[in-house]
Amino acid sequence: PAPDADFRRFVGELQAYHGYPRRVTVTVNMRDSVLVLSRLHQRGSRAGRPDPSELGPEDAQWMVEASQRLDFDLISARAGDLPGMDRRSHVFWYDHPWVSSDVLLKMLFHFEPGQRGLQRNRSEAGLQYWTFPQDYEARLDAVMDGLVRTAAAQAQQDEKTSTQ
């Protein structure tokens, strides 16, 4: 979903369509200045800067369960976790190399967050979310090295098959 989607509507729609795509991923920045203004203008929090208190108990519990068992990933993009990111950034998903690399790994290879080098966390309420760990650069290098090895092995296999 777009980060500016209404949070409550997003949760309702996610409950209906979560089984159709491979995964649904939302990356949030709780200090996103554009989404602060959007919340004021639209009179409700946005998917990219959600306010869980807007949900009723059933929807809140569904989100906790979805984060643990379903094809839904919540990623926290905090400036404190992302070197050089402006804490109020709205363009971090394409402006920051860690986040844009994560987006590409998800879109091109359909990797789950752990496979992309992200770190699993849980809130006090049990909501599972993912963060960029301090050693993300090294984790990303390992992921990329694995992709290169896999591609090289596939190319070698293709070459053997074509010469037989």
Locations of the language-model features?
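Lipolytic serine-hydrolase domain surface
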Residues: 2-161
